[in-house]
């Protein structure tokens, strides 16, 4: 294992909602691939403690989804703060990618980055300013070649590591079926 500036950092957050001014991070996971999307390492998947008062602000969809997955129970039992989760994630990433080299990779990753900027600024700063957002290809495929969308189905567990693995697989699918190389 050595840090390589061509490796890609994939990240997913689960949050109590979509508004970083009101909602908080409740789970973070990262993995690293090489430039060809081969998974090199999975980082820690961390349930981030939030207060009962914060969890009570979740809307019906988030309560149903995160209770059903067991995440709410893991968050309540966790003793890991956002800051500690941030530092553990950076420690993992330093082994694989130098700071400032990898774009932030994932699905609808701009939303995750908004939360990182507010609650995990050191981690947000670890990424290059660019984005590798798989949802961009999905939106283009929906408009330009909608028939290929049926070829990739997500499980949609809304568990951070599962979601990242699906994002990597989805990009590999688009590389094979949508992008002409």
From Swiss-Prot:
GO terms for molecular function: 3'-5'-RNA exonuclease activity; nucleic acid binding. GO terms for biological process: DNA metabolic process. Its EC number is 3.1.15.-. Keywords: Cytoplasm, Exonuclease, Hydrolase, Nuclease. The active site is at 129. It comes from the Bacteria. InterPro entries: Exonuclease_RNaseT/DNA_pol3 (IPR013520), Oligoribonuclease (IPR022894), RNaseH-like_sf (IPR012337), RNaseH_sf (IPR036397). Its main location: cytoplasm. Residues 8-171 form the Exonuclease domain. GO terms for cellular component: cytoplasm. SMART domains: EXOIII (SM00479). It is found in: Cytoplasm. Belongs to the oligoribonuclease family. HAMAP family: Oligoribonuclease (MF_00045). 3'-to-5' exoribonuclease specific for small oligoribonucleotides. This is Oligoribonuclease. It comes from Klebsiella pneumoniae subsp. pneumoniae (strain ATCC 700721 / MGH 78578).
């Amino acid at each position: 294992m050595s840090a390589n500036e061509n490796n890609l950092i994939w990240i997913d957050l689960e949050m109590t909602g979509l508004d970083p001014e009101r909602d908080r991070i409740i789970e973070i996971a990262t993995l690293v691939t090489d430039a060809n999307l081969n998974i090199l390492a999975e980082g820690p998947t961390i349930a981030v403690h939030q207060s009962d008062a914060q969890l009570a602000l979740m809307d019906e969809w988030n309560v149903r989804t995160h209770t059903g997955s067991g995440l709410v129970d893991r968050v309540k039992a966790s003793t890991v703060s956002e800051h500690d989760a941030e530092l553990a994630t950076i420690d993992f990433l330093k082994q694989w990618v130098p700071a400032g080299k990898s774009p932030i990779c994932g699905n609808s990753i701009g939303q995750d980055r908004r939360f990182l900027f507010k609650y995990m600024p050191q981690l947000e700063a670890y990424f290059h300013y660019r984005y590798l957002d798989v949802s961009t290809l999905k939106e283009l495929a929906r408009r330009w070649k909608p028939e290929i969308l049926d070829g990739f189905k997500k499980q949609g567990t809304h568990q951070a590591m599962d979601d990242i693995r699906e994002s990597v697989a989805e990009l590999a699918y688009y590389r094979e079926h949508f992008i002409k190389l």
